[in-house]
């Protein structure tokens, strides 16, 4: 099992949690981004840079992931593709996307897009606070404990 991170939009506090977990659990974490970013020296943490462009990082993640891998993303269409390929997706607020909930989440996202396109001000998500950070860490720990077998 590997962890892939849609890194361009991933909050720094979430990356820090991922870096600590990578070393503690000895799980490979790969950040995929369209620009260089600093990562700590670790045999478990990698950075894959891709060219700039719409969904280039997303497409690379889908191409590289294997069934059973975990993808960290707030991008709901990417999460849906990951699940279709047999992977798992976790958003930075600690919500695990599953086969059971992804369709309704995708429908709500599409509805909100339609509302915004018609001029309705829907606002964006609030900044990640302590409770979301804790929810993410807890969900990540549960997932890794259940699914990762260190070699």
UniProtKB/Swiss-Prot annotation:
CDD domains: PIN_YqxD-like (cd18720). It comes from the Bacteria. Pfam families: DUF188. PANTHER family: UPF0178 PROTEIN YAII (PTHR35146:SF1). Belongs to the UPF0178 family. NCBIfam families: PRK00124.1. This is UPF0178 protein Spea_2958.
